[in-house]
């Protein structure tokens, strides 16, 4: 994997609050190598180490995108949801930002069936077929469509399992992470001071609660993906 320069700026990360961890009582001892200090009862992440792993993650996604690989971004808590959707749309990635439905990856055949149903209902709605049904039937199908849009809207174009999954909050998205581990899908995780850095292929020590921190990390990663995609298109 070729190392590239991603303009990862320590001052910019400090301004976004990337270095602020959780309260010292909530920490995971496995995070000790990534913590530089305690301040007013919270752990402070070592941003030099963060920058190193952040750069490695950018190299990985660039390399994967330049080979035409597919990405899934997962972040369902309120503070992450909007940033996940906008970052994923910018880089033409799949995303889950409302709720990870158990078995979404490990029971892919069921997910695929739901996606087919979703696409069929969307097509019927677009063609005006739902409005020609009895009111009760139309209302039921519209509710079903709304439910599918909420939970599957970000993966509606997926035709198979992703090649790499980017996870915003390891604790919040543990079910998704566990499914990736089961299937051997490589993961990149933002890990706060209460997380286990050994569970992801690349762990980026960072504040996973601040919107500015989440947005900064995701924007850099999707910029690397976009550059990789451009390289893939040029070399086809």
UniProtKB/Swiss-Prot annotation:
GO terms for biological process: translation. It comes from the Eukaryota. It is found in: Plastid, Chloroplast. InterPro entries: Ribosomal_uS2, Ribosomal_uS2_bac/mit/plastid, Ribosomal_uS2_CS, Ribosomal_uS2_flav_dom_sf. CDD domains: RPS2 (cd01425). Keywords: Chloroplast, Plastid, Ribonucleoprotein, Ribosomal protein. GO terms for cellular component: chloroplast; mitochondrial small ribosomal subunit. Its main location: plastid. GO terms for molecular function: structural constituent of ribosome. Pfam families: Ribosomal_S2 (PF00318). HAMAP family: Ribosomal_uS2_B. Belongs to the universal ribosomal protein uS2 family. NCBIfam families: rpsB_bact (TIGR01011). This is Small ribosomal subunit protein uS2c. It comes from Drimys granadensis. The gene is rps2.
């Amino acid at each position: 994997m070729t190392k590239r320069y991603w303009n990862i700026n320590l001052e910019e990360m400090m301004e976004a609050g990337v270095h602020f961890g959780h309260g010292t009582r909530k920490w995971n001892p496995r995070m000790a190598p990534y913590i530089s200090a305690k301040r007013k009862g919270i752990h402070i992440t070592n941003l030099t180490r963060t920058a190193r792993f952040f750069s490695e993650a950018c190299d990985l996604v660039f390399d994967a995108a330049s080979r035409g690989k597919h990405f899934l971004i997962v972040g369902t808590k309120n503070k992450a949801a909007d940033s996940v959707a906008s970052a994923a749309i910018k880089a033409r990635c799949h995303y889950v930002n409302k709720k990870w439905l158990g078995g979404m990856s490990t029971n892919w055949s069921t997910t695929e069936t739901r996606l087919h149903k979703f696409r069929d209902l969307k097509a019927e709605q677009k063609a005006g077929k739902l409005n020609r049904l009895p009111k009760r039937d139309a209302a039921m199908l519209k509710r079903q469509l709304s439910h599918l849009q909420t939970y599957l809207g970000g993966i509606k174009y997926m035709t198979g399992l992703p090649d790499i999954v980017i996870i915003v909050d390891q604790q919040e998205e543990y079910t998704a992470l566990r499914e990736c581990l089961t299937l051997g899908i490589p993961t990149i995780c933002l890990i706060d001071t209460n997380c286990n850095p050994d569970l992801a292929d690349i762990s980026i020590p960072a504040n996973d609660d601040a919107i500015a921190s989440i947005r900064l990390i995701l924007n850099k990663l999707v910029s690397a993906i976009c550059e990789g995609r451009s390289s893939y298109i040029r070399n086809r």
